[in-house]
Regions:
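Conserved non-catalytic scaffold segment of RNase H-like nuclease domains
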Residues: 1-92
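Substrate-recognition/cap helix-loop segment adjacent to the acidic, metal-dependent catalytic center
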Residues: 89-114
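Active-site catalytic microenvironments for nucleophilic, acid-base chemistry
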Residues: 97-101, 141, 166-170
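Short helix-to-loop capping/linker segments positioned immediately adjacent to catalytic or ligand/cofactor-binding
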Residues: 78-85, 104-107, 146-151
């Protein structure tokens, strides 16, 4: 238990997503609050950041149940489906917890995970950036205002979906590249906090 707890320094406390059709229109959403297995208290600053309190996680689902529900939600629509996320951090986090908590995956779930698409990496490549761009900064480059609560899984997904729509056409991508170049600065004081720190892994207090 001590070894597992030391490995799992952060646990997933929420799984959230929106589903898009072929025209990139939102047709469904998924949200589950997860009860951590090893950590029982969330730092107040993370409660404020995410809107998820310790009390909420204590009423949440086990990770295994929530993950299987998410996978089933994805697969129930039938046909081809691909998970698109802002950065590969979510995939790495899920993979670590699946391994640590010994979650058995079906063949369909394995295929679903293998098809994960890192949209942040694509966006960085589009702008020819060697560093990772935050979702907030990417939206600024696309001239899109963030809608909803930041660090809420569903709202982050919804804003990622909007960014995906804004980069669908070559003309739109070219416009974003030009805007990014006009806004880019080498002044380190102008870099956003999310460029300096990775908030994707929220550490509950153990």
């Amino acid at each position: 238990y001590k070894l597992e707890k030391s490995i799992c320094k952060c646990e997933t406390i929420e799984i959230g997503a929106v589903m898009l059709d072929e025209q990139l229109r939102e047709i469904s959403e998924f949200k589950r609050i997860i009860k951590p297995k090893y950590c029982t208290k969330i730092y107040p600053k993370y409660e404020k950041m995410t809107g998820i309190t310790t009390a909420m996680t204590m009423e949440g689902e086990a990770f295994e149940s929530a993950f299987h529900s998410f996978a089933q939600w994805c697969l129930d629509k039938g046909g081809e489906i691909q998970i698109i996320a802002w950065s590969g951090n979510d995939l790495s986090q899920l993979a670590r917890e699946i391994y640590l908590k010994r979650v058995e995956l079906s063949q369909e779930e394995k295929i679903l995970m293998d098809g994960w698409r890192d949209f942040q990496k694509e966006f960085d490549h589009m702008l020819d950036k060697e560093y990772q761009i935050s979702l907030d900064l990417a939206l600024i480059y696309a001239d899109v205002a963030f809608v909803g609560h930041r660090h809420d899984a569903v709202w982050d997904s919804r804003n990622t979906a909007e960014l995906l729509r804004r980069t669908r056409e070559e003309e739109d991508r070219t416009r974003i590249v030009h805007r990014a170049k006009s806004l880019f600065t080498t002044d380190p004081l102008a870099v956003s906090l999310e460029e300096l720190f990775n908030f994707s892994c929220l550490v509950p207090q153990c």
